[in-house]
Amino acid sequence: MSHTPATRAELITLVRQWHQDSTPWIPSGQGTRLDWGPALDPDHAVLSCQHLNQVIDHAVDDLTITVEAGLPLVDLQRLLAAQGQWLPVDWPRGGEPTTTDRSDDESQSQAGTIGGLIARGLSGGLRQRHLGIRDQIIGIGLLRSDGTAAKAGGRVVKNVAGYDLMRLLCGSWGSLALITEVTLRVQPIRPAHAG
């Protein structure tokens, strides 16, 4: 069964209740990659964060953005492009939906959320030039399995205090904590030139 809380408060309440009831659950964004990895146990609840998809802060001049983890990557890129910026990451090939009855935007929005991208530690071909998603993360908000919220990192690029939990959570598949928000380093879109 899938649960999709509409607010962070609902999310915390639900996770705390599941912790008290010893209900097993698995985190999910849009659910596009639930078939990756081991088969889901029918007794496990699926916790979708797709409604937690807001921009929390966009410091255009500082080239950073903080978003909730349920924001689709395509929506993030569209929002950044309006400011002449982009996040230099892409999904690896083979994860896109195969149906042809969708427009490119709809197909890409089904490719996944920023939280799913980080939880899976996925990177496409852009990592060869711009590094992977783990190198773009400068801060992260998380929710432990007991419902305790925590944050690591910050909202500035030059942040070196504390443990590097961002790298630890990147690629953990949600097994260590549920990613609720993330602060990312973005780059300006370079002007195209002929030649």
Residue ranges, per PLM feature:
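Glycine-rich beta-strand-to-loop/alpha-helix junction loops that act as flexible
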Residues: 26-33
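Short glycine-biased active-site loop of nucleotidyltransferases that positions the nucleotide triphosphate
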Residues: 35-41
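Mobile "lid/hinge" segments at catalytic clefts and subdomain interfaces of large enzymes
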Residues: 139, 143-158, 163, 168-195
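Conserved nucleotidyltransferase catalytic core and NTase-mimicking acidic/glycine-rich helix/loop elements
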Residues: 45
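Generic hydrophobic alpha-helical membrane-span motif
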Residues: 35, 76, 121-122, 180, ...
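N-terminal glycine-rich flavin-associated loop
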Residues: 1-25, 49-106, 117, 121-155, ...
